[in-house]
């Protein structure tokens, strides 16, 4: 029962984190500011001083094919863009991956990989199923990284996809670039990014602590069962 209770707390905090991100990137940090209709279904109301523009105003496609022998293989995951495990086999069929430069944003184009995206901290290569974007000078990459991680953006992104099977839709850049996104004043974009970096780190630390508690309890439970089964501890 205690493990189930802690698990429920973790889920509640995950939901809270998600709502904190969505609120900050779509409505800002100041609840008292006047709002206006954005005219965009997935956004709804936005602060009066914010604008809206297409993604293409802030990102351009990087579409250079390379080999993972020349550029270390990276994986685009829900946790961001990470070095691929050494156990994953290297390919032998030439330039069959996409180049990623440090600071690029990558997102998996397939709907069954929903939420897999992030800014790369590395130069490397990713599989062709990913869209790799180079931020333009006027893009605050960290703010948009938070925006692109929201459920609302994921819904909109995959809505622009094509496919026969619902859970295997693929969204191409020629459609993604048309998606309209919020544009807060540049200094506010930085404030939002900094706030979310700090706030989400705090939430994640609590979640990690609770997960550690579950592991400790599970381990204790297993050791008790082992002792009873082996007769080292008597019932009653």
Model feature map: region roles:
Residues 1-33, 183-236:
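Amphipathic alpha-helical coiled-coil/heptad-repeat segments
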Residues 30-31, 118-119, 164-170:
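Short beta-strand/turn micro-motifs at beta-sheet edges
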Residues 37-66, 190, 213:
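Non-catalytic DNA-recognition/assembly elements of restriction-modification systems
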Residues 39, 56-102:
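Sequence-specific dsDNA recognition surfaces
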Residues 69-78, 98-99, 117-128, 137-138:
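Short, surface-exposed loop/turn microsegments at beta-strand edges and helix-strand junctions
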Residues 106-107:
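Hydrophobic beta-strand signal
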Residues 110, 124-131, 164-190:
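A short glycine-rich beta-alpha junction/loop motif
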Residues 111-115:
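Short, charged beta-turn/beta-strand-edge "cap" motif at the junction between a beta-strand
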């Amino acid at each position: 029962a205690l493990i189930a209770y802690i698990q429920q707390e973790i889920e509640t905090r995950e939901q809270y984190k998600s709502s904190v991100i969505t609120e900050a990137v779509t409505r800002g940090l100041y609840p008292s500011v006047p709002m206006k209709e954005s005219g965009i279904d997935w956004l709804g109301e936005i602060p009066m001083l914010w604008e809206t523009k297409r993604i293409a105003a802030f990102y351009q496609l990087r579409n250079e094919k390379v080999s993972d022998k020349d550029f270390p293989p990276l994986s685009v995951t829900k946790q961001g863009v990470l070095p691929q495990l050494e156990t994953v086999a290297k390919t032998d069929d030439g330039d069959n991956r996409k180049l990623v430069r440090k600071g690029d944003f990558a997102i998996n184009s397939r709907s069954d990989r929903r939420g897999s995206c992030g800014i790369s901290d590395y130069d490397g290569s990713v599989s062709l199923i990913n869209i790799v974007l180079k931020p333009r000078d006027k893009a605050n990459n960290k703010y948009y990284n938070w925006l692109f991680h929201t459920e609302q953006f994921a819904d909109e992104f995959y809505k622009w996809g094509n496919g026969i099977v619902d859970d295997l839709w693929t969204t191409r850049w020629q459609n993604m670039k048309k998606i309209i996104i919020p544009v807060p004043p540049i200094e506010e974009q930085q404030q939002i990014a900094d706030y979310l970096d700090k706030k989400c780190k705090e939430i994640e630390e609590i979640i990690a602590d609770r997960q550690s508690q579950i592991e400790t309890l599970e381990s204790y439970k297993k050791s008790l069962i082992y002792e009873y089964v082996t007769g080292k501890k008597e019932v009653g």
